[in-house]
UniProtKB/Swiss-Prot annotation:
The chain crosses the membrane at residues 165-182, 234-256, 276-293. GO terms for biological process: fatty acid metabolic process. It comes from the Eukaryota. Probably involved in the regulation of the fatty acid metabolic process in chloroplasts, especially chloroplastic galactolipids monogalactosyldiacylglycerol (MGDG) and digalactosyldiacylglycerol (DGDG). This is Protein CHLOROPLAST J-LIKE DOMAIN 1, chloroplastic. The lineage of its organism: Eukaryota, Viridiplantae, Streptophyta, Embryophyta, Tracheophyta. GO terms for cellular component: chloroplast; chloroplast envelope; chloroplast inner membrane; chloroplast membrane; extracellular region. It is found in: Plastid, Chloroplast inner membrane. InterPro entries: CPP1-like (IPR021788). It is a multi-pass membrane protein. Residues 183-233, 294 are chloroplast intermembrane. Interacts (via J-like domain) with ARC6 (via J domain). It comes from Arabidopsis thaliana (Mouse-ear cress). Residues 74-152 are annotated as: J-like domain.
Amino acid sequence: MAPALSTSCSSVMAFSTSNALRYHHPQISLRNSLRAPKSPSFVRLPLGKVLQSRIVIRAASSAAGNPQSDADFNPYEVLGVNPIEGFDKIKQTYGRKLKDAQRSGDEATAALLEKAYDKLMYAQLMNRKKGVTFGSFKVSKDIKYADKQPIIPWGPRFSRSSKNDMLINLAISVVFSAWIAIKRNVEYKPLQFMSFVFVYRIFEKLKSFEAPSSPIYNEEGEESGRGLRMGKRLLRSLSLVFGSILLASLAYTGFLNGIEYMGYSIPMVLYNNQELIVTASSAFMLYVIASFYR
């Protein structure tokens, strides 16, 4: 009996030990396993990124040429000018406002002014063959005659002045020519005064045709390059005026030399009226240069 009892006890202990060493499978509820974690249906971005994305989208739309924004954009309201005003007046207003905006550091206003001016320039190019669009709004002279380039790059360029300016130039030429015709003993004084008057007239004409440029300021707050531009205008004005006088003087001298070369004697009328002829011919050439060229 003893051996049998010992055997049964050992078998019971072995069965208990084997059950104790078994891994219990975790009981996972089917309901819990099918439950999905709660998550929002949209992605939330910080407010700064949202505003930045809106700005990028608007900039891309503007760069792509949004037709609705271009249709609503009025360049005349941006520049604060009247559509019937001349283009030279519009250009001066644009240059003044652009300079003020850049000086104050307002980049948004400067960009808006440049966009308005570019749109008006494009309209000018489209209407350059018409001459006048409506009212007294005329195509700018440098756009209307843009393809009429001179043979010499630094030579005079065709630029017809307004009727009022042409009358002023004609009056100046007539007055100084009449002065030397009435008073023969003044020598070349009328020519000297007339030359300085036409230097000023041509200088102002060149200034009105100068395209507005973005000013560059140095460390002291002064605009750099302004003196250089004024110097170029003054040098060109002096060159045009004194070049015309030199051409008239050479023409007179060459004419007299040609008469002598052909074996004829110089008439006394030409010989005694040298100052009058040179001054009158110079006045005519200066009138043509100041009225039709720049």
